[in-house]
A protein has these predicted regions:
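A membrane-interface helix-boundary motif in multi-pass transporters
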Residues: 175-193
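Structural signature of the two symmetry-related core transmembrane helices
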Residues: 95-110
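Helix-to-loop junctions at the C-terminal end of transmembrane segments
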Residues: 79-92, 177
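Juxtamembrane intracellular "pre-TM" segments in multi-pass secondary transporters
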Residues: 2-30
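Pair of pore-lining "gating" transmembrane helices in MFS-fold secondary transporters
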Residues: 23-43, 125
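Interfacial helix-cap and linker-helix signal at transmembrane-aqueous boundaries
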Residues: 51-52, 87-88, 175-181
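Short amphipathic helix-loop junctions that connect adjacent transmembrane helices
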Residues: 46-64
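Intracellular juxtamembrane helix-capping segments at the cytosolic ends
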Residues: 133-146
Length: 195
């Protein structure tokens, strides 16, 4: 397929990005993708410390347990992404995104109050399942909100913003854990998804 590109060569990349951030739906979804990636990666750095100190796990098993928990969340996220087509036949995409973000926020609180490692892992996997809906649906909604000939620049900017979330999540969660304790990371991540 070939498209006739209608982008003015004199128009700067920054002005193109600004023009799309004026669209409320695009701005909201780009922010959501940033916060989603921020929340997904934010728990990673504190998870071993949380399991070791608050759940009193033996040092030799902490890395294995954390690996299993992260794998479970990733696996369930992939399963959710695969099943989006069937779910969008029954529910609207905005409703799925809204439900998924609230479910993830609730599940982060449940992860914090779980007294056992396996309960934490189960709730993390379920949170991963709901996270698997957010990114593909948000990207689809963004693509519907912008003209075809300008999607490349928009998705380039969206990818950059999502990567910033991946980088800032661990940095800020480490700072929050240092200042307020590991529990504050779970609560602040939940708050991000409730926003």
């Amino acid at each position: 397929l070939q498209f006739e590109h209608k982008v003015d060569a004199r128009e700067s990349q920054l002005s193109l990005i600004k023009s799309f951030l004026v669209i409320p739906r695009v701005r909201l979804l780009v922010g959501l993708l940033f916060l989603c990636n921020f929340g997904i990666t934010g728990i990673g750095p504190i998870l071993p410390l949380y399991i070791k100190h608050y759940m009193h796990m033996n040092d030799e098993f902490v890395a294995t347990i954390v690996g299993i928990i992260i794998f479970g969340a990733g696996l369930f996220s992939a399963l959710a992404s695969i099943s989006i087509g069937k779910i969008t036949e029954r529910l609207t995409m905005p409703r799925i995104v809204f439900t998924a973000t609230w479910a993830v926020g609730t599940l982060f609180i449940l992860q914090y109050i779980m007294p056992s490692i396996w309960g934490l892992g189960i709730f993390r996997a379920i949170a991963g399942f709901f996270m698997g809906f957010i990114t593909p649906i948000a990207n689809t909604l963004i693509s519907k909100a912008v003209p075809i000939e300008r999607r490349g620049i928009v998705f380039g900017a969206v990818s950059s913003v999502a990567m910033m979330g991946n980088v800032l999540g661990p940095v800020l969660s480490g700072m929050i854990a240092h200042a307020f304790g590991c529990g504050a990371v779970f609560w602040s991540t939940a708050a991000i998804f409730f926003v």
